[in-house]
Amino acid sequence: MIGLVVILILLAAFYGGSRRGVALQLVYSGGFFLSFLVAQKLFLPWGERISLLLPYLSVSPDTKMALFTQEQSFDLDKAYYAAVAFIGFLFIGHLLTKFLGIFASGLRYTRFIPQVDGLIAGFLNVIIAYIWIFLIFKLLTLIPLDAIQGLFKAGSVPRWIVEKSPLLANYFNQMWIIDLI
């Protein structure tokens, strides 16, 4: 079921991007990746600050984490706060980009290569949507609730996305798990 939802989100993202056209989608994509770089620089100090404001569920010796060992699960609060800070900065930057994109809406009708303009723009938007899906699933892996951890049982789509996504899986595992725990 979750796999179907992911596919529908990616199809909707492709449709939205292809309707925008490459010129406008490049504005949105550039803003997203600029926000990504800002979030990458700021998430660590802010992750420590929000730990005082945002509660993290306590991990008990009986807690079963789908993707982490028992030892790692006791230190996942650091990774959780870092992930929340990163996603928060990325979300704020994405909203600012969407707002600024309103002023660039005239680019919607600018076509670089009319034959493939929609395909390129749709593909760019799918990449952004996939990154969001990955980040949400990665954040969920850090929450020690059985119902949420059940989403990541062996062979599930969310688990595959979190573990096997090219570039993203290793990058965020290094940034949020290995470097912090």
Predicted region positions:
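Alpha-helical transmembrane segments and their juxtamembrane interface "caps"
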Residues: 1-181
